[in-house]
């Protein structure tokens, strides 16, 4: 399968047959739906893996952080208007670049969430549930956790007889039984 190649000033992303091309530079979509980003180190054939992301915009922001670090003002960015606000890596190591990428995508996620809340704060019908995917190892760690065990609860400072608004349990039980069980 012949891949798409950048020609001249085209803004189309490259596709080497490994994923769906994107409108953003340095971004492609995997078959299973994740958006990924990577960049080539200048002067070498080495690539730096920037990560896997939920949206193409997050992946494009990741690319912009790395491209701006390596190429400065000469970089062809996906979001040139954000160049001055992008986090800067401490050095050119792949770990430093990924840390800056992580910070940038967190900021982008927060901005997207805040703007979505401002657009329609009166209705929750536009809010989609967030699915959290855990690895089998993370699930096992949660299952083996002692956070909710009786011994942990015995040693906690939580007083089950008192609620946050200072209503005592006996008063609550009386109040609850007055309207729940009466016909």
UniProtKB/Swiss-Prot annotation:
Probably acts as a transcriptional activator. Binds to the GCC-box pathogenesis-related promoter element. May be involved in the regulation of gene expression by stress factors and by components of stress signal transduction pathways. This is Ethylene-responsive transcription factor ERF021. One of its GO terms (molecular function) is DNA binding. GO terms for cellular component: nucleus. It is found in: Nucleus. GO terms for biological process: ethylene-activated signaling pathway; negative regulation of floral organ abscission. Belongs to the AP2/ERF transcription factor family. ERF subfamily. SMART domains: AP2. Transmembrane segments: none annotated. PROSITE patterns: AP2_ERF. Gene3D superfamilies: AP2/ERF domain. Residues 23-80 bind DNA. The keyword Signal does not apply. Residues 1-12 have a biased composition (Polar residues). Residues 1-25 are annotated as: Disordered. Keywords: Activator, DNA-binding, Ethylene signaling pathway, Nucleus, Transcription, Transcription regulation. Its main location: nucleus. The keyword DNA-binding applies. CDD domains: AP2 (cd00018).
């Amino acid at each position: 399968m012949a891949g798409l190649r950048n020609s001249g000033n085209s803004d189309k992303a490259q596709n080497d047959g490994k994923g769906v091309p994107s409108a953003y530079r340095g971004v492609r979509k995997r078959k299973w739906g994740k958006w990924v980003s990577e960049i080539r180190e200048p002067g070498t054939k080495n690539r730096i893996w920037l990560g896997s992301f939920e949206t193409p915009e997050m992946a494009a922001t990741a690319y912009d952080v790395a491209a701006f670090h390596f190429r400065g003002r000469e970089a062809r960015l996906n979001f040139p208007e954000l160049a001055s606000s992008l986090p800067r890596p401490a050095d050119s190591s792949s770990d430093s670049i990924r840390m800056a990428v992580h910070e940038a995508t967190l900021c982008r996620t927060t901005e997207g969430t805040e703007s979505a809340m401002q657009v329609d704060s009166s209705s929750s019908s536009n809010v989609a549930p967030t699915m959290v995917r855990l690895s089998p190892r993370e699930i096992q760690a949660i299952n083996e956790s002692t956070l909710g065990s009786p011994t942990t609860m015995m040693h906690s400072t939580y007083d089950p007889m008192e609620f946050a608004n200072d209503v005592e349990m006996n008063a609550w039980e009386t109040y609850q039984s007055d309207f729940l069980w009466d016909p």
